[in-house]
Amino acid sequence: MHAVTESMAGRAAVLHLLPLSTVESPKVTLLRGGYPEILAHPRDSNLWFQSYLQTYLERDVRHISQIRSLAAFRRFLTLIASRTGQILNKTDLAAPLGVSVPTITEWIGILETTGQIVLVPPYFENFGKRLIKSPKVYLTDSGLGCHLLGIDTARALSRSPFSQALFEGFVASEIVKQQVNLGRRRELYFFRDQRGLEVDFIVPHGAQELVLIEATASQTVYPNAARSVLSLARSIRNHRTRCVVVHHHRCWTKTMPYLPQALER
């Protein structure tokens, strides 16, 4: 786009190509992610991700910004993977890398521009607060996240302390992919109040309805898994609500195909 010398506003459409979703391919899993090359050759995943990261850093990142140290940016990406599902705290990210907060702000912008992360802001009735409060950060592709965190088998994933956060990111990415593929505006939020009530995701559906989503990496789901979404639903007065619990079954994405159906109704 840097080579375009005249404005294309109103004359061109920009398409955002993300990794494949579970709707587009049943081979997409939490461990593999959704890059087509990985789905076609799963045994070569580590080698492919290594090559992908090298190409991404040396071509995409360097093309966007004159970063002095690509090695530092690579460590930053790994640090983001370890903080997936957490509130974005730029100061905490800057300290271990020995860089400034403005540098972290720039690097976050690069990751967002290149589609590597999904930023999920908090939900407030006041729209202005959504723009001010810090978002949660997730990697767009769970397979890349697993690679960065050294998770290369389903057994390692099930035992990893990052499994819940990675699964939340997987769900967030599926929602965003669906919205993008349907040509809709990206609208995805999380909820947390001062009393400690927290709901993983809120998706506006039209002007009058909110879909409340809880994502759990547990293989077995009990009724209390819906406690948070039901509690929030009871407190919402000016919107209709629907509650969805997405769980991590033996097959990593067994329940995921039902999520898009829930959002489309």
Predicted regions and their residues:
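Switch/connector loops and helix/strand junctions flanking conserved nucleotide-binding motifs
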Residues: 1-3, 23-24, 147, 222-224, ...
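Short regulatory helix/loop adjacent to the ATP-binding pocket of P-loop NTPases
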Residues: 1-14
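Accessory nucleic acid-recognition modules appended to NTPase machines
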Residues: 43, 47-210
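Arginine/glycine-rich "motif VI" loop of SF2 helicases in the C-terminal RecA-like domain
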Residues: 180-181, 231-239
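Active-site ExK catalytic segment of metal-dependent nucleases
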Residues: 211-220
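Active-site-adjacent loop/helix micro-motif of nuclease/hydrolase catalytic cores
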Residues: 219-229
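Domain-level recognition of nuclease-like catalytic cores that cleave nucleotide substrates
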Residues: 248-265
